Amino acid sequence: DGIQNLTGLTVLTMFDRLITDISPLRHLTNLTDLVLHTNWISDIEPLSGLVNLERLIISENPISDIRPLAGLTKLRQLHVHGLYPNQLQYWLDMDDGRDPDVVFNGITDISPLAGLTELRLLRIHLNAISDISPLANLTNLIHLRLYDNQVEDISALADLNKLVLLWAHGNQIEDISPLSGMSEMQQLSLNDNGISDIGALGNMTEMDHLFLSDNTIEDIAPLQRLQALEVLRLENNDITDVSALAGLNQLRELSLARNWSLYDVQPLLRNAGIGAGDELDLRFTAVRCSDIDAFANRGVTLLRVTTVNGSGCPGRRLEDP
């Protein structure tokens, strides 16, 4: 009460306060930085006139309509992502008067973002978004998180060549060719999609973290030029040939678990960069126990169950990854 009189405020943080009504904030037109995450806010219309905002964090609220954001053209950072189901249940279990009938993760229309061309960071994950075409002109974006949505077509990202981080796992993406020009990419997560062709990744030579698990990838040859890779996760694909990884000497964490037909890892043994302190996951593959022991002798930390004869190597317990 009375916050509407603090018209000189430029920064305001009110998170996890069970706030439902933000109408007093409409008067705070000098705000440049506003944090309201983890409340119970559904109506963000009072924000529509806060045209000086450069950072806005309204994540983990039951917001479905983001039209009031359309005029906030100075925004450089916007967080409007949803909740994980276990988070929602946690808050409902608090029994502190929250309306249990509100809808989280309900954003479907992101067209109000189309004119926010100053955005550098955008987090819209954990929603119900299928059409990301409004992002096409946001060419200043550096960080974009849109995972756990319903996206199939990422052609709108083709000109977002400043991206260094893209997390798009948990969608229905099959064609990643629009990413081919993103030579500055450093962290890319595409787990749990429908990807088989990763040719578009071949020029991402700055990449240090790459996540491609739970797809249908057989050919990983395009990865051989990604000399900066430190973390690579390829579990649950259809990979049998790992020769492309022989020269990736910066790898410190590599997972090939659940590539059930993977047998020959000699190229990895030729990789002089894989050694003490590095982590290698070969669970639920057909890799020979003798090769697994060779990695162990180098000091590699191994998660080392195989499917040979349906059991682990001698002395090792069969366990789920």
Please provide the spans of the model-predicted regions.
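Low-complexity, Pro/Ser/Thr-rich intrinsically disordered segments
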Residues: 315-321
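Concave beta-strand-loop units of leucine-rich repeat
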Residues: 5-20, 24, 30-42, 46, ...
